[in-house]
Amino acid sequence: MLDIQLLRKDLDGVAKRLADRGYTLDVAAFSALEAERRAIQTHTEELQARRNSLSKQIGAMKGKGEDTSAVMAEVGGIGDDMKASEAKLGEIQARLSDLMLGMPNVAHESVPVGKDEADNVEARRWGTPRQFDFEVKDHVDVGTPLGLDFETGAKLAGARFTMLRGPIARLHRALAQFMIDTHTQQHGYTETYTPYIVNPEILYGTGQLPKFADDMFRVEKGGAENTVTQYLISTSEISLTNTVRESIVDGAALPIKLTAHSPCFRSEAGSYGRDTRGMIRQHQFDKVEMVQVVAPETSYAALDEMVGHAEAILQKLGLPYRVITLCTGDMGFSAAKTFDLEVWLPAQNTYREISSCSNTEAFQARRMQARFRNAQGKPELVHTLNGSGLAVGRTLVAVLENYQNADGSVTVPEVLRPYMGGMERIDAPAQAS
């Protein structure tokens, strides 16, 4: 959530910055609510002052033995008026809150202004795409003989679900283990196991609700009269970041660095017809997530560090990639600045997103009321960051395509072999004669 003081101080400036993100701020609606809030608040303060004055008058009158019934009746009437004003003020503040919950974060000044992904800026590349001396297959054709089973996944759960079997399932698990081990042993993160189902207020904290309810899978429990609605997580960023919800952290404890391997569940409501073949866009996929909770003055250094941590995974796997600075119009709702990592997929002859690392500054912290005690001992909002380290399924796709061989086998990247029992390559099972 944006700082309401920023809106009150520079409403037109904020509206311009949000317009750069493709969001139209209803300046008239906000201004009208603010004017109404100020009027009611002023009226309430006047009533309070009048009641205080009358209370003193009653004390003086009683000291003189005078009749106070008329004055006390007026005080009672003021009390009723104050309750009505406070109720109205609460209603206005709730409407302001609803309006602000729908506003995205403002972009950092270093973010390039643009409309969509066409305006993103490439920051750098790493690695050279492999030159194949045979016809390259995509991950579906490479993986299907090795245990990638889309047919059974669809039979069990419908489109955009996949079954993995045998060595390819083991390779998928090996990738996640390798990522977690790297982040915990080399990058300083604490491994965390989180709930996969969370309460609605948790999603308000990180910004998925109310705007993106259609992208979430919802579950309900209880009978008709006591139904409780919860949500499957679309990323473990949600649960990891909310660990500091409604708390004041000791400044000496920062930075807090957490990582988790979890399934992620997304309805992909706006993705009809996109990436319908293969594992690129699934309703259920695994991801290793990185989250950092830091002091405000260190958050952009932390963002660079986090991007480096995601890059390290790709470099150790020997997968060519590029780093993209997202423009204002392509960033996620909560982000102030985002870098995407895109891995090379030879069958598509292009780079595809495999990680997104974002600094949300105080946007999520304000929604969660997550604070730390600064050097002066005063509570201050933390900054929160999140990043994929990496999407496991898409990394599997990249390994299958970049490490495929002419005979249909797949070479196991060297760093994964300890997790694969020393296996150097995955071969299709021999066909029965």
Swiss-Prot record:
<feature type="binding site">
    <location>
        <begin position="235"/>
        <end position="237"/>
    </location>
    <ligand>
        <name>L-serine</name>
    </ligand>
</feature>
<comment type="similarity">
    <text>Belongs to the class-II aminoacyl-tRNA synthetase family. Type-1 seryl-tRNA synthetase subfamily.</text>
</comment>
<dbReference type="GO" id="GO:0005737">
    <property type="term" value="C:cytoplasm"/>
</dbReference>
<dbReference type="Pfam" id="PF02403">
    <property type="entry name" value="Seryl_tRNA_N"/>
</dbReference>
<dbReference type="InterPro" id="IPR045864">
    <property type="entry name" value="aa-tRNA-synth_II/BPL/LPL"/>
</dbReference>
<dbReference type="Pfam" id="PF00587">
    <property type="entry name" value="tRNA-synt_2b"/>
</dbReference>
<keyword id="KW-0648">Protein biosynthesis</keyword>
<protein>
    <recommendedName>
        <fullName>Serine--tRNA ligase</fullName>
        <ecNumber>6.1.1.11</ecNumber>
    </recommendedName>
</protein>
<feature type="binding site">
    <location>
        <begin position="266"/>
        <end position="268"/>
    </location>
    <ligand>
        <name>ATP</name>
    </ligand>
</feature>
<dbReference type="InterPro" id="IPR010978">
    <property type="entry name" value="tRNA-bd_arm"/>
</dbReference>
<dbReference type="InterPro" id="IPR042103">
    <property type="entry name" value="SerRS_1_N_sf"/>
</dbReference>
<dbReference type="GO" id="GO:0005524">
    <property type="term" value="F:ATP binding"/>
</dbReference>
<dbReference type="GO" id="GO:0004828">
    <property type="term" value="F:serine-tRNA ligase activity"/>
</dbReference>
<dbReference type="InterPro" id="IPR002317">
    <property type="entry name" value="Ser-tRNA-ligase_type_1"/>
</dbReference>
<keyword id="KW-0067">ATP-binding</keyword>
<keyword id="KW-0030">Aminoacyl-tRNA synthetase</keyword>
<feature type="binding site">
    <location>
        <begin position="353"/>
        <end position="356"/>
    </location>
    <ligand>
        <name>ATP</name>
    </ligand>
</feature>
<keyword id="KW-0963">Cytoplasm</keyword>
<dbReference type="InterPro" id="IPR015866">
    <property type="entry name" value="Ser-tRNA-synth_1_N"/>
</dbReference>
<feature type="binding site">
    <location>
        <position position="289"/>
    </location>
    <ligand>
        <name>L-serine</name>
    </ligand>
</feature>
<dbReference type="InterPro" id="IPR033729">
    <property type="entry name" value="SerRS_core"/>
</dbReference>
<comment type="subunit">
    <text>Homodimer. The tRNA molecule binds across the dimer.</text>
</comment>
<comment type="function">
    <text>Catalyzes the attachment of serine to tRNA(Ser). Is also able to aminoacylate tRNA(Sec) with serine, to form the misacylated tRNA L-seryl-tRNA(Sec), which will be further converted into selenocysteinyl-tRNA(Sec).</text>
</comment>
<keyword id="KW-0436">Ligase</keyword>
<dbReference type="InterPro" id="IPR006195">
    <property type="entry name" value="aa-tRNA-synth_II"/>
</dbReference>
<comment type="pathway">
    <text>Aminoacyl-tRNA biosynthesis; selenocysteinyl-tRNA(Sec) biosynthesis; L-seryl-tRNA(Sec) from L-serine and tRNA(Sec): step 1/1.</text>
</comment>
<dbReference type="GO" id="GO:0016260">
    <property type="term" value="P:selenocysteine biosynthetic process"/>
</dbReference>
<dbReference type="InterPro" id="IPR002314">
    <property type="entry name" value="aa-tRNA-synt_IIb"/>
</dbReference>
<dbReference type="GO" id="GO:0006434">
    <property type="term" value="P:seryl-tRNA aminoacylation"/>
</dbReference>
<feature type="binding site">
    <location>
        <position position="388"/>
    </location>
    <ligand>
        <name>L-serine</name>
    </ligand>
</feature>
<keyword id="KW-0547">Nucleotide-binding</keyword>
